[in-house]
Design a protein with these regions (language model features):
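A glycine-rich dinucleotide-binding beta-alpha-beta segment and adjacent secondary-structure elements
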Residues: 68-70, 92-93, 98-173, 179
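A general structural signal for short secondary-structure junctions and capping/turn motifs
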Residues: 10, 58-63, 75, 130-131, ...
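Active-site beta-strand/loop architecture of penicillin-binding DD-peptidases
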Residues: 73-79, 172
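Mid-to-C-terminal "cap/lid" subdomains and adjacent gly/pro-rich loops that border
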Residues: 1-67, 198
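Structured loops at beta-to-helix junctions and adjacent beta-edge loops in soluble globular domains
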Residues: 5-7, 23, 71-75, 142-144
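Short His/Asp/Glu-rich catalytic/ion-coordination signatures at enzyme active sites or charged loops
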Residues: 81-95
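Fe(II)/2-oxoglutarate
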Residues: 56-58, 85, 114-115
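Glycine-rich loop(s) and the adjacent beta-strand/alpha-helix scaffold that form part
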Residues: 1-12, 166, 179, 185, ...
């Protein structure tokens, strides 16, 4: 979301980092709401990708008076969510979204809070699956090869010399950047699996 207040200029190049998770576990029914964080400073030319009909000078003006946040909810695991390869070699993505109600509640609360702080307009730009980051899942970790791809140390059940140390073993990203946890898991796998001796 972009929060705009034409009375306040925000012409920074490198915006400070801010994030809040005050409502993370406030979703009820087992679905967390998520996190809200600044995404850096969006420039007018960047806005052009989703506002093609708006003149660039106007987008630059808006950008000079806005702050931009990503409102990210946890994508909880679901057995029907999967990536497969079709007979013709095409990648097939099946995704069942189970937390949209709670995501919309998080979005509502974030907008309400930004309005209370004086922002005059708030614009939402939803991203579909083609705008992906923080990919997690698809190589389920577990002890049973019938229901999982890797063990707890990311070692493939089918190929014992193959370790899949990326975000695939996560059941969820927890609405956070998984990079540090992936790095920690890689160090754990190397230490516990004697890979350092290879």
């Amino acid at each position: 979301i972009a929060a705009i207040d034409m009375r306040r200029k925000n012409d920074v190049t490198f915006q400070k980092t801010l994030s809040f998770t005050d409502w993370y576990l406030d979703g009820g029914k087992g679905y967390p709401l998520g996190a809200v964080q600044l995404i850096g400073k969006v420039q007018g030319i960047m806005m052009k990708s989703f506002a093609k009909h708006v003149p660039l000078p106007l987008l630059n003006l808006v950008s000079d008076h806005s702050v931009e946040f990503v409102v990210m909810s946890e994508d909880l695991p679901h057995p029907e969510n999967r990536v497969t390869i079709a007979q013709n070699g095409a990648i097939k993505i099946a995704r069942k979204s189970v937390g949209m109600k709670t995501h919309m509640e998080l979005l509502r609360r974030a907008k309400k809070t930004l309005r209370k702080t004086g922002y005059q307009a708030i614009f939402r730009q939803p991203f579909d699956i083609s705008m992906n980051s923080h990919q997690c899942g698809t190589t389920v970790a577990g002890t049973d090869p019938r229901t999982s791809v890797v063990n707890g140390y990311c070692r493939s059940h089918d190929h014992h010399n193959l370790y899949l140390i990326d975000g695939g073993f996560f059941p969820s990203s927890a609405a956070m950047n998984p990079a540090l946890t992936i790095a920690a898991q890689a160090l754990r796998v190397v230490a516990e699996s004697d890979l350092s001796k290879v």
